[in-house]
Amino acid sequence: MIAGRRHFDCRPLHLAGNINYEPTVWSRADALKVNENDPTTTQPLVSADFPVMSDTVFIWDTMPLRELDGTVVSVNGWSVILTLTADRHPNDPQYLDANGRYDIKRDWEDRHGRARMCYWYSRTGKDWIFGGRVMAEGVSPTTREWAGTPILLNDKGDIDLYYTCVTPGAAIAKVRGRIVTSDQGVELEDFTLVKKLFEANGTYYQTEAQNSSWNFRDPSPFIDPNDGKLYMVFEGNVAGERGSHTVGAAELGPVPPGHEDVGGARFQVGCIGLAVAKDLSGEEWEILPPLVTAVGVNDQTERPHYVFQDGKYYLFTISHKFTYAEGLTGPDGVYGFVGEHLFGPYRPMNASGLVLGNPPEQPFQTYSHCVMPNGLVTSFIDSVPTEGEDYRIGGTEAPTVRILLKGDRSFVQEEYDYGYIPAMKDVTLS
């Protein structure tokens, strides 16, 4: 089933020329097809005895170093990943319970407020060695450093890190630095000048003034293989005052009888946003209308990113069970849309959009998946059930899995080691 289209009043675009398109609608009828028990779209169970890559920090969103076509790269034989990172506080009185024991669950839940961008390096594509922070304290203009994408620009080792500056506000930003390698390891240097690129505009994307719990983050830049221009996808919410959106015929889709009542679904207004750069330097950007909207379906379309394969545009995003609209449900995991052109139209993969979800018996085992062009999918471990109602907190890399993309469908294949993120190409610095 082809997802619907939602009309936007597109104002003239200075940088984008004559680009004209309507966003694809991920409809409620599409989402009703989500099947949490389909083995072809279910991630294998993660064992509760998983290893932890660090006893001193939590990690979650993982960002492999890559090029603008999506190729995951190593540099002089060293693989590099960036992660959202926060210190663990086993001895902090704030995180000790009444019996003096470390409350790791509360520490984990509080991590977002102290998120920092850190890096790791490896000769093997696993067995990651902690490198430290990318930006020194005080370089980023906000209190939180949230997810984005590190791009290797050339064989001189220059890197553009696109990321999200959060609190106060939320802005897409970038900072340029460089990678230096030796036989002993890797250093990321000179990430000292942050440039804010753009914020939500209230025309295409919801602002904080329109909705205090708005989403605007997770930049992922790429070169369109067809026109050679530099674009960026990101997470947003469809513009408009909270509660003012209409779940109309396009948003409903061809639902079966009895599913016309959407309750409070107008509050879920997620979308995958798009921007275009003036040139390949990525210094000046213009916001475009969303590529995919999820009004009445889901409020979060986090960490969108592309895989280009077989002449198709595979657009992936991640979302949660708890952000689905009333009357709908689906697992935490990867959702995807596929089309033949950057501007759509797109079709929800596997008819529903679900590509790789957590198993029902372990609904929170992994999150923040990143699909790489070689079909490998990385994620982090959130929490895995143990005995009774208890569970074990992760804050570490999950086992990597591979998915097979076949037209509009996807199939789970092999499972690999924890945090296995091999380079697809090695770049030798000049």
UniProtKB/Swiss-Prot annotation:
Query: Thermal profile, per the record?
Result: Highly thermostable. At pH 5.0 and pH 7.0, sucrose hydrolase activity progressively increases with temperature until 55 degrees Celsius and then falls quickly.
User: To which species is this protein native?
Assistant: Pseudomonas syringae pv. actinidiae
Q: What else is known?
A: Strain KL103 contains two functional levansucrases, Lscbeta and Lscgamma. A third copy, lscalpha, is non-coding because of a premature stop codon. Lscbeta and Lscgamma show different sucrose splitting and polymerization properties, and differential expression, suggesting two distinct roles in the physiology of the bacterium.
Entry's family note: Belongs to the glycosyl hydrolase 68 family.
Q: Which residues form the active site?
A: D61 (nucleophile), E302 (proton donor/acceptor)
Its assembly, as annotated, is: Homodimer.
Induction trigger: Expressed both in presence and absence of sucrose in the medium. The expression level does not change in a significant manner during growth.
BP terms from Gene Ontology: carbohydrate utilization
InterPro entries, alphabetized: Glyco_hydro_68, Glyco_hydro_beta-prop_sf
Stated name of the protein = Levansucrase Lscgamma
**What is the name of the gene encoding this protein?**
lscgamma
MF annotations from Gene Ontology: levansucrase activity
Q: Which Pfam families match?
A: Glyco_hydro_68
Name the domain of life: Bacteria
The enzyme class is transferase
Q: What task does this protein carry out?
A: Catalyzes the synthesis of levan, a fructose polymer, by transferring the fructosyl moiety from sucrose to a growing acceptor molecule. Also displays sucrose hydrolase activity. Can depolymerize the levan produced once substrate is completely exhausted.
Kindly state which keywords UniProt assigns to this record, in alphabetical order. Answer: Carbohydrate metabolism, Glycosyltransferase, Transferase
In this chain, the site described as Transition state stabilizer is at: D218
Q: What is its EC number?
A: 2.4.1.10
- List residues binding sucrose: W60, D61, A147, R217, D218
User: What is known about this protein's pH dependence?
Assistant: For sucrose hydrolase activity, shows the maximal activity in the 5-7 pH range, while the activity decreases at pH values lower that 5 and higher than 8. Levan polymerization occurs mainly at pH 5.0.
